[in-house]
Design a protein with these regions (language model features):
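The feature preferentially marks the first beta-strand/turn patch immediately downstream
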Residues: 1-122, 126-187
Length: 187
């Protein structure tokens, strides 16, 4: 779909192998997956680092929701003051030259704002306070937010994005959540 939960739990930073369906990096330089010990997750390919942890604590400053009325992100610390844990933590690290070499259709360079806006566009239509509210999308977006635990931009040089989620796939490669934008910020 072009809207709804697919916008904030996946994207074009990866591409699918046409025979196996496993993800390969398309726009990311490297990735790391940490999953909760005991989950049935197995890596097949060697392009990502895979670790286990007894507990994955979501940082308080991770963005977990969007306040359409105030036009601001809601952090984990604000929404879950007692803390939040996740089943998986995905880290996507983009190439050092991402902002110089990747261009949009009009020639403008991709920017951090494009990544941030992609997350907003994935959630905003579910918010009744939003001028973009769409009741037909709200249920699927809200369903995705139940297992979504947060995004956090930890660096812009190189761009490094952490994602936290409770939904997981048995194939480690399919748990990388790159937040790749589908359109430029200015659209």
């Amino acid at each position: 779909t072009s809207m709804g939960t697919s916008n904030f739990i996946g994207g074009g930073g990866l591409m699918a192998d046409p025979y196996t369906g496993l993800a390969y990096p398309q726009r990311i330089a490297r990735a790391e997956l940490t999953y909760k010990t005991g989950l049935p997750i197995t890596p097949t390919l060697d392009w990502l680092t895979v670790n286990q942890a007894d507990q994955i604590t979501v940082p308080e400053d991770a963005w977990v929701d969007w306040d359409a009325a105030a036009q601001k992100f809601i952090t984990v610390g604000e929404k879950f003051p007692d803390g939040l844990t996740a089943n998986i933590k995905s880290v996507s690290v983009y190439p050092d030259d991402l902002f110089e070499t990747v261009k949009w259709h009009d020639g403008s360079p991709i920017s951090v704002a494009d990544f941030v806006m992609s997350f907003i566009q994935g959630i905003d239509p579910a918010k009744p306070e939003s001028p973009l509210y769409d009741a037909s999308l709200a249920l699927s977006i809200d369903a995705g937010l139940v297992s979504f635990k947060g995004y956090r931009i930890v660096s812009t040089d190189p761009l490094t994005i952490e994602a936290y989620n409770d939904t997981y796939n048995a194939d480690a490669e399919l748990n990388i959540l790159p937040l790749w934008p589908l359109s430029p910020f200015g659209l």
